[in-house]
Amino acid sequence: IRDRLSTKPEQILDTIHSRCQHVYFKPIDKGQFINHLVDESLTRPVAEMLSTYTTQAETALSLNEEYDLTSLRKTIIRWCELLLTNRSMALIGIIDLLKQAKNRKLQLLTLSAVNGFFEDIMHAKVEVNSEYIYSDLSVEIKKYAKHLTYNQLILMYDQLTEAHKKLNQNVNPTLVFEQIVIKGVR
């Protein structure tokens, strides 16, 4: 019998998964994680964005060293705003988005960050007093929350979940992001 540990149970084959013993650990508190990354010299906005993607400090720090995450974050925010205000421009904006998110890791980070943007809107909509992932955009987030219905937000969550699946199945990233625009918030 071999002992194996995995932090990605979704990548284990079903036949093996059924024979596994599952042990779940509570992930680090998001606020603590963000503060830890800030202490490690990341900017708060980048740390907040990375907290949507990982709870592993090493992963977050290496991504920050390898890539220009400040620029990626700005592009993601711009694209999210286009999704809500001008869908035809959001389709065109995919080109800029994928120029920044040029590999699978960054594309998954982008999807997680987009999900975080809509999570903030949902928190504002239900008036949950939690920390926003995009703390510097709280005014804009609340404005979007007033204009979106619960059904629109749920539809967007469904599209983002589907996009994650498709990206993990190696579907062309342009097609994945186009589907978010086409089938997302209307």
Features from the language model and the residues they span:
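Structural recognition of the conserved hydrophobic beta-strand(s) that form the central parallel beta-sheet
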Residues: 1-7
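Charged, glycine-rich active-site and insertion segments that engage polyanionic ligands
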Residues: 7-113, 117, 124-186
